Each structure stands twice: as structure tokens, then as C-alpha cells.
Swiss-Prot record:
Part of the ABC transporter complex CcmAB involved in the biogenesis of c-type cytochromes; once thought to export heme, this seems not to be the case, but its exact role is uncertain. Responsible for energy coupling to the transport system. This is Cytochrome c biogenesis ATP-binding export protein CcmA. Residues 3-204 form the ABC transporter domain. The lineage of its organism: Bacteria, Pseudomonadati, Pseudomonadota, Alphaproteobacteria, Rhodobacterales. One of its GO terms (molecular function) is ATP hydrolysis activity. It comes from Ruegeria pomeroyi (strain ATCC 700808 / DSM 15171 / DSS-3). It catalyses: heme b(in) + ATP + H2O = heme b(out) + ADP + phosphate + H(+). GO terms for cellular component: plasma membrane. It is a peripheral membrane protein. The gene is ccmA.
Length: 204
């Protein structure tokens, strides 16, 4: 499934942050999202994932195809690692959780409550949810936060496997994941500020 974005404009808190953005994301490809802090990367990912509406433009190919992993891991702290994955698997159609446990080395933590995990372990569990969604397009917002070097490599391998199976990924990160991916710099698409009112204009 190809994701096509055409002349997109988005806002954060009612203030436009990006405009005129167009790109395509085809199966088997990854796109790395770059730009300074506050440029609108998170807002873009949230908009593409359907969590907020765009100001203008078109998003095609996203219907029920996107899995989003943001800054919040979205875990149920009183449930075990296994129970968390089973919960999300049920939400997305009841997929086998074994690949998720194995892909992020969570087997030894399977019975531990999510609330008792370290920050890095929580992040791994949050990312493991991607593997039980069955959705082909991944939207990832700084996915390597709290991960050590081995876990970053594990994550990169998971993304490569996903791409190899015909999936795609849009990733906001400043870390070199070693992926064969193009870079989308949102800097040139930052919204122009609205012109200020001229209180003296009526007197000129």
C-alpha cells in the first residue's frame, strides 16, 4: 500500500507549522523525517496517523493501514508484558504475539508487569506492539529514545524485516539506523507566519 501526501498543511495548537508538503511512501521503503525541534515532525506523524485533522491537502492510502508509535508507549502498567501484547493483538485482530516477544527480546520479561519495567524495557515493549498490529505502514516518533546500543540494533533489524516483507516506515529520528532510506527534511515546508495587522494602516 502506497501512502501519498499532497500539498499538506498542518497545525499544532491552532498554529500552522507545515504547509505545501508532498511525498509518497511506497512498499518496502523507509523515509527518515528530519528537522529542528519544534518544526512539526511529531504533528506530521500524528496527522498522518489520523490522530488530528490536517488544515489542507490530501492523505491517500492511510485508511486502517498505519501503526503509530509516539513518545508515549501506551502500555497498561498493571498488565504483564504478555498481557499487554495480547491486548493489542486483540484490538488489531488477534495476531500471534510470539514474533513480538522474540523480536524485541522480551521472552524473559513475559510475566513481568509493564509498570515494573525499566525505561528501555518499556520502550521495547511499546515498539513490539507494532508487530501485532498487522499494519503495513509504520509511523515512528523518535523510536530509539531510552534504548541502548543493542536495542537500537534490534529495532533496526525489525524495521529491515518489516520492509523486506513489503511494509514501509516513516521515522522521525536523529540516530543513524543504517537503513537504506531517503531523508525528508521538513524545514523547507515550515509555515510562513501570518502577516501582522497594521494598526496605523487606516491613517496612511
Amino acid at each position: 500500500m502506497t501512502l501519498t501526501v499532497t500539498d499538506l498543511a498542518i497545525a499544532r495548537g491552532g498554529i500552522p507549522v507545515l504547509e505545501g508538503l508532498s511525498f509518497t511512501l511506497t512498499p518496502g521503503r523507509a523515509l527518515i523525517l528530519r528537522g529542528p525541534n519544534g518544526a512539526g515532525k511529531t504533528t506530521l506523524l500524528r496527522t498522518l496517523a489520523g490522530l488530528q485533522p490536517p488544515l489542507a491537502g490530501r492523505i491517500e492510502g492511510a485508511e486502517d493501514k498505519i501503526a503509530y508509535a509516539g513518545h508515549s508507549d501506551g502500555l497498561k502498567p498493571t498488565l504483564s508484558v504478555t498481557e499487554n501484547l495480547l491486548f493489542w493483538a486483540a484490538v488489531f485482530g488477534g495476531r500471534d504475539i510470539t514474533p513480538a516477544l522474540e523480536g524485541f527480546a522480551l521472552g524473559d520479561l513475559a510475566d513481568r508487569h509493564a509498570g515494573n519495567l525499566s525505561a528501555g524495557q518499556k520502550r521495547r515493549l511499546g515498539l513490539a506492539r507494532l508487530l501485532v498490529t498487522g499494519r503495513p505502514i509504520w509511523m515512528l516518533d523518535e523510536p530509539t529514545v531510552s534504548l541502548d546500543r543493542d536495542a537500537v540494533a534490534m529495532f533496526a533489524d525489525t524495521v529491515r524485516a518489516h520492509l523486506g516483507q513489503g511494509g514501509s516506515a516513516l521515522i522521525a529520528t536523529h540516530i543513524d539506523l543504517g537503513l537504506d532510506a531517503e531523508v525528508l527534511d521538513v524545514g523547507p515546508y515550515r509555515a510562513r507566519p501570518a502577516p501582522l495587522d497594521d494598526p496605523d494602516g487606516d491613517f496612511l
